[in-house]
A protein has these predicted regions:
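Extended, beta-strand-rich, solvent-exposed assembly scaffolds of outer structural proteins
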Residues: 52-58, 70-73, 91-93, 100-233, ...
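Structured, hydrophobic secondary-structure cores that serve as assembly/anchoring elements
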Residues: 1-112, 139-140, 144, 194, ...
């Protein structure tokens, strides 16, 4: 191609030039929560859309973790996107050698059966080499995640008929869940081997997962016990690979160490887990003659639930959300903490993340001991003291209450921090109005599906709370339980001391920042500046038309892109915005005038 023309000789050249850039729509309703759950991956982000999804991944709560579970589930009553991170403090995985090894101790007298596999990443990078190599003490199968819930699992297997011709399949309890007996796979035939297939069933022995004891949770038909086996289409078919990749309940551990199998692979086939030997025509059923239906049912045990999470474990979970470029999130929702000082520590830590990201807010509630079970006056004092210990920040949003909700899983009433529902109200405001509308008041600020609140402050108490930048949650006669304030924790008088303004600017900044990526590495000239202005102004006009701002001005010209700025390879644009203000105080003047007075004479005088 020539320097100044598209061709050195006469020709027709077609070019497409795209000047249709717009400021993109951005999400404003995604939450992030770290808590203690009975099941599920640890220190890994999982996006859930509703309560049923929360149960499916993290299991229904018991009494120990009901508060954290319902804190997450109540946010999902208002919206449909919550990243959940499970923390772990001492939780251990159940495994199939728990009974034989539960009394084993090391040289220091410590129990040696502790197994902790927290997530797929943890398994792949650390634990697989320790527990999957047939030389550890994990047993043949390990529960997928830490927790006593894994003790409800049983893994049952059925090998191919043995060399004596015994058809194990006919004597197996779970034959009805499979189409036919296991035989020889195509992989084995291709490698001059026989009888390598095996069926595996994962059973909910006690009914803790499904509510029905003995339910079949998963089935894996026609797996191969030959190491490295694949299906005709090239997919892994070695039973350890399949379980590791597909099972939601177990990992495949060390076969040789499981007491149910005995030493040296007795009762399971002495060639299981080996490569087929083409020269010797491997018969993978060798050694399975002692198989029985009872022997096939490997009960998992030794699983231990997590204790209450420490500050370090909670903050480690939230560290997964510290990079705004890799994960989109709008609310960082802290769980209930162990002490008042812990609640302050976590709130201030999350505020630091929010201020670094500049695209999310942190709704927080005081510690439970200062709110539940104390007088309303003391609760008010404690809420204000809690707020006074927090950092000054427009990214913090403080409320004063706990919500009384019904825990249907444990048939009890519990109190949960209000902050997750406060975040939910803000997310719901995005759907019914826009982020720049106040979430407070009877139009948008009602709390859903709650029985009561710990305290309902009166007018005087609400005044004291609001002065301390604490948003009261109150039971207002004729209205219900509502968020009765829309302040951030910005203590300096500012437009950013209101939630709607903070969230307005978050939305605008995110959208325009995305649009600005299109001008990176372009020339800082009049054309590029005009292109940028033509992208930004329609966005601001639309927000103005939807009542988010009253006026604006975009400056992006030679006045702020001086020759010095251009020579530094910089680009400067300034957006001047007058945000809409929510009504916090209403004054109604009722003026009596004499009969003969013209209203024009008195209007404006009072």
């Amino acid at each position: 191609m020539a320097l100044l023309s598209p061709s050195l000789s006469p020709a027709i050249t077609i070019k497409e030039i795209d000047l249709s850039g717009v400021a993109p729509n951005v999400s404003t309703s995604v939450g992030a929560f770290v808590g203690n759950f009975r099941w599920g991956p640890v220190n890994s982000r999982t996006l859930v859309a509703d309560e049923s999804g929360l149960v499916r991944v993290f299991a229904a709560p018991n009494e120990d973790n009901a508060v954290d579970f319902h804190s997450a589930s109540y946010f999902l009553k208002y919206t449909n996107a919550l990243y959940v991170v499970r923390g772990n403090n001492g939780g251990q995985n159940a495994h199939s050698s728990w009974n034989a090894l539960r009394n084993a101790v090391d040289s220091d007298g410590a129990v040696t059966t502790d197994i902790v596999v927290e997530s797929r990443e943890d398994w792949d990078t650390v634990n697989k080499s320790a527990y999957n190599n047939d030389s550890g003490n994990s047993g043949a199968f390990i529960a997928k995640y830490p927790g006593a819930l894994g003790n409800a699992l049983t893994v049952s297997f059925c090998p191919a008929f043995d060399s004596d011709g015994t058809n194990h399949f006919d004597n197996w309890s779970y034959k009805g869940s499979f189409d036919r007996e296991p035989t020889t796979s195509q992989y084995a035939l291709d490698h001059n081997a026989t009888k390598d297939e095996m069926h595996i069933a994962i059973i909910d022995r006690t009914g803790l997962f499904t509510g029905t004891p003995g339910s079949v949770l998963e089935t894996f038909p026609h797996l191969s016990v030959a190491k490295g086996a694949v299906t005709p289409d090239g997919s892994p078919n070695y039973f350890k690979d399949v379980l590791d990749n597909q099972s939601e309940y177990v990992w495949a551990g060390a076969l040789a160490d499981d007491s149910a199998f005995g030493a040296s692979f007795a009762n399971i086939g002495q060639y299981w887990g080996t490569l087929p030997d083409v020269d010797s025509a491997t018969d993978f059923s060798t050694g399975t003659s002692a198989w029985t239906d009872a022997v096939s049912k490997l009960r998992l045990g030794g699983g231990v639930n997590s204790q209450d999470l420490t500050n370090s474990q909670i903050t480690t979970g939230f560290d997964l959300f510290d990079d705004a470029e890799t994960i989109q999130v709008d609310f960082l929702i802290p769980p209930q903490s162990s002490t008042d000082s812990d609640a302050v520590t976590i709130a201030n830590y999350l505020n630091g993340i929010a201020k670094d990201r500049k695209d999310c807010v942190v709704p927080v509630s005081p510690h439970r001991n200062g709110i539940v079970g104390v007088s309303t006056a003391n609760a008010n004092t404690n809420a204000i003291a809690f707020a006074n210990d927090l950092s000054n920040s427009s990214y913090l949003i403080v409320d004063n209450n706990y919500l009384k909700v019904f825990d249907k899983y444990n048939d009890q009433y519990i109190y949960i921090p209000a902050n997750s529902s406060t975040a939910g109200i803000m997310a719901a405001t995005d759907y019914v109005a826009a982020p720049w509308f106040s979430p407070a008041g009877q139009r948008r600020g009602n709390y859903l599906s709650i029985t009561d609140i710990a305290h309902s402050p009166n007018k005087t108490q609400r005044d004291a709370l609001y002065k301390a930048n604490v948003n009261p949650i109150a039971n207002i006669p004729g209205v219900g339980i509502v968020l009765y304030g829309d302040k951030t924790h910005e203590l300096r008088p500012s437009a950013f001391d209101r939630i709607n303004v903070r969230r307005l600017f978050i939305g605008i900044e995110k959208s325009i920042a995305q649009a600005a990526k299109n001008i990176l590495f372009e020339f800082n000239d009049e054309f590029t500046r005009a292109e940028f202005v033509n992208v930004v102004e329609p966005l601001l006009r639309e927000i103005q038309g939807r009542r988010g701002i009253t006026d604006f001005k975009v400056v992006c010209d030679e006045t702020n892109n001086t020759p010095a700025v251009v020579d530094r390879n910089e680009f400067v644009a300034s957006m001047f915005i007058k945000p809409a203000r929510s009504i916090n105080f209403v004054t109604l003047n009722f003026v009596a005038v004499r009969t003969g007075v013209d209203f024009e004479e008195v209007v404006g005088t009072v």
